[in-house]
Regions:
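Phosphate-binding and adjacent anionic-ligand microenvironments
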Residues: 2-179
Length: 179
């Protein structure tokens, strides 16, 4: 497909950003949710987007999540590059993710806890569009409330599984210390 801008949500891997920028495009993020991704894609005239669940949005065909389009794009790229899957995988950035959650009780609300975190001194770049996302040089943490139960979800990404899990557990401990 043609080169250009891409979009994924705040809880998705940095890999799309890295690949987009390597190829001279611009990467944009959106809050979690397909409609947020699609709206941002339309605003930025993105050529590709999606969320971390594997469903991609490819506007050249339609503005909807379509895992089969993702498979077709992957297979055509694999064929064009004449590589094995493992060779292709090793050519892309490697990141690992971890997930944790904190159940709130005693009337504590996720919004108040997230606000307290956002106002604290943080050592990264803060994004408040969907909870609290903090980007560090080689990792990130995204803290967001559930819309269905009193919990805060913790999503992290780092270069190794151990690094991602360590970051998730550190933030779980930080949040628990605020409760």
């Amino acid at each position: 497909h043609k080169k250009g801008s891409t979009v994924s949500n705040l809880s998705s891997s940095r890999a799309l950003r890295d690949v987009t920028e390597i190829h001279g495009g611009k990467y944009f993020s959106s809050p979690v949710g397909l409609m947020h991704v699609i709206n941002e894609m339309k605003k930025k005239k993105a050529v590709f987007g999606g969320e971390g669940n594997g469903g991609v949005v490819y506007p050249a065909l339609h503005y909807g999540r379509d895992a089969l389009v993702g498979v077709a794009l992957f297979l055509s790229h694999l064929s064009r590059m004449s590589m094995s899957v493992s060779e292709l995988r090793s050519a892309y950035p490697k990141y690992e993710m971890a997930k944790e959650k904190i159940e709130l009780s005693n009337g504590k609300t996720p919004d108040k806890v997230l606000e307290k975190i956002a106002k604290s001194k943080l050592a990264g770049t803060l994004d408040r569009r969907d909870g609290v996302k903090i980007d560090f040089q080689n990792s990130w943490v995204h803290l967001r409330k559930s819309n269905t139960e009193p919990i805060i979800r913790i999503y992290t990404e780092a270069g190794t599984k151990e690094g991602a899990m360590k970051l998730a557990l550190e933030w779980k401990q930080k949040i628990n210390s605020l409760l």
